[in-house]
């Protein structure tokens, strides 16, 4: 039985989500930290994200997680402590922690997630490492203990995990280094090539996330950036079909991985997936036209 004081943590490169059982609340913040003069915390979470691409040279803003694994253990520990402290209003009590990790990483990398909670000074009574695909399935109200095969595609910021679930376990899993970051970089490069315009990563993400609404309104994406030729800030309208075209290559990379997993799936589980479809999760899975392209494939 899960005790009353417990936390479930989903660490993503872009976002961190923490569920508190005691008050049935969920906190979602950007998984970013701003460090001043290489040592002092200047801002964290959404506040750090607001400063991204705008901060002076003495403030470094970074993601402590990269490609599904912990890249900066010290700052990740500081973030976990700060977020748990915020959720408990400064009164951190002994609690059990359940943390979701990718399946297709090494045992050493998985151990790092356990050590992260142990060393974050959050009074952990018990630490359980849960495979992320299983946690995703439970979060979507899928009966993961059923014998029915389930295909889950989790598209995150810099990785995508494709998994087959059945009988409470993971039958097959594949982690690839493609996600929202690659999508945004494709948008930036296309805008630069076609319009001689430099835009930031946050602007590229805003363009990508607004494509669906813009298409409904019959509009292009109006963006502000720096003209490479004259070196001055300018405004441009980017056609939505140009953005869709540049994203398709990365969509196909993910779809190819789905096909590889399906080719290795036992026939009976494959039949279940054919009947019940694919479950999409992760922030970048909402990118316009991905689901449509996957269905056609």
Please annotate each region the language model reported.
Residues 1-157, 165-278, 285-297:
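Nucleotide/phosphate-binding catalytic cleft detector across ATP-hydrolyzing
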